[in-house]
Amino acid sequence: MITEKDVEHIGSLACIDLSPEETGLFAKQFNSILDYFRELDEVNTDGVEPTHHVIGLTNVFREDVAGESLTQEECIANAARKEKGFIKGPRIV
């Protein structure tokens, strides 16, 4: 069972300030989720074949084939900022 103290600890680990109301609400929600998992644990799955994909899709990959592409000049033609033949992006600090 998840207590309000557990929720406060989780909140501190995530660096999230929780109000007392939120702490109580989240404790109830966590316990509700865990109760649902307990119900799932009780489901009889004898005779049910394990599956990895519910809808049975297989990998649908295509060959990686190089096609026609733009020249460098065509690529940078509409760029707002360019420098020495390259697109110049904003400085990120």
From Swiss-Prot:
Instruction: Provide the transmembrane region boundaries.
Output: none
Keywords noted in UniProt = ATP-binding, Ligase, Nucleotide-binding, Protein biosynthesis
Q: What class of enzyme is it?
A: ligase
Family matches, as InterPro entries: Asp/Glu-ADT_sf_sub_c, GatC
A biological process term (GO) from this entry: regulation of translational fidelity
Functional note: Allows the formation of correctly charged Asn-tRNA(Asn) or Gln-tRNA(Gln) through the transamidation of misacylated Asp-tRNA(Asn) or Glu-tRNA(Gln) in organisms which lack either or both of asparaginyl-tRNA or glutaminyl-tRNA synthetases. The reaction takes place in the presence of glutamine and ATP through an activated phospho-Asp-tRNA(Asn) or phospho-Glu-tRNA(Gln).
Descriptive protein name: Aspartyl/glutamyl-tRNA(Asn/Gln) amidotransferase subunit C
Which source organism? Methanocella arvoryzae (strain DSM 22066 / NBRC 105507 / MRE50)
